[in-house]
Design a protein with these regions (language model features):
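Extracytoplasmic thiol/disulfide redox context detector
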Residues: 2-9, 15-165, 179-182, 186-212, ...
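Short strand-coil-strand connectors
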Residues: 62, 218-219
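Short secondary-structure capping/turn micro-motifs that flank functional sites
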Residues: 157, 220-221
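Conserved NTP-binding/hydrolysis module of P-loop NTPases
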Residues: 167-169
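Conserved, helical-rich catalytic subdomain that frames metal- and/or nucleotide-binding sites
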Residues: 171-178
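Short, exposed beta-strand-loop hairpins at the edges of beta-sheets
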Residues: 224-225
């Protein structure tokens, strides 16, 4: 008798939880549909999920985080910070969204450079006409015991594509790349060979790489921009 009563109560709780879950899922879909309608076709809403603040929802547009209310009346751009701990919840969430699997990268599509024992690994997405990429490359010359994979993505201008082809198709792609990025020696040659540029561009689109330089470490973390060498070394140290 007691067992039957317990099972009956458990069944009621399970049904209640299921119904609550269904209601939450339905609410999220309604908010997503309303936000998508208001933003139009130029912005793709990937997902809408409850935010850690009561009454707010996280809206993921592309790889960018926004927030909205339950009626999808407002779109909020900003960061949520937990006052008790000082933790930037939005920043942490953004880092998780931007993370990739290192194994998803294709080394054959990159210019590979090994220094010292090559034990530390770094992937860099670069455009040959990117000023910040040139600044980064000068800093990266200070690194040792590292393997750097440089993925060329010509996103800045038509000339970027031509330079990328000339670099990739040269007899020594890494030397040609560094000669241009660090020493200012313009690549020569016709650049007529099979290149991985289209594959690199497709990868960039899939993973939301919209600017150069963009760096990735073996834990999948993403660092955009001309990162300071001290920050790169600090990140390497954290991976040990």
């Amino acid at each position: 008798m007691i067992l039957n009563k317990f099972l009956s109560t458990l069944g009621i709780i399970s049904i209640a939880l299921f119904c609550a879950g269904q209601a939450h899922a339905q609410q999220e879909q309604q908010v997503k549909a309303e936000i998508q309608k208001k933003l139009g076709s130029n912005a793709k809403v990937k997902s809408v999920t409850p935010a850690p603040v009561s009454g707010l929802y996280e809206v993921l547009v592309g790889n960018d985080i926004f927030y909205t209310d339950g009626a999808a009346k407002y779109l909020i751009q900003g960061e949520i910070i937990e006052l008790a701990s000082g933790k930037n919840i939005t920043e942490q969430r953004q880092a998780d969204i931007n993370r990739i699997k290192w194994s998803d990268l294709t080394p054959a599509n990159a210019i590979k450079n090994v220094r010292g024992n090559g034990s530390r690994q770094l992937a860099v997405f670069s455009d040959p006409n990117c000023g910040y990429c040139k600044r980064l490359e000068k800093s990266l010359q200070q690194l040792d015991n590292v393997t750097i994979y440089t993925y060329l993505i010509p996103i800045l201008s038509p000339d970027s594509a031509q330079k990328s082809k000339q670099i990739w198709c040269s007899s020594d792609p890494y030397k040609t790349y560094i000669d241009w990025m660090v020493n200012g020696i313009t690549p020569s040659g016709k650049g007529e060979c099979s290149t991985p540029l289209d594959k690199n561009m497709a990868f960039a689109k899939t993973y939301g790489i919209t600017g150069t330089p963009t760096l990735f470490f073996t834990d999948g973390s993403r660092f955009p921009g001309a990162v300071q060498i001290t920050d790169i070394e600090k990140k390497f140290s954290s991976l040990k």
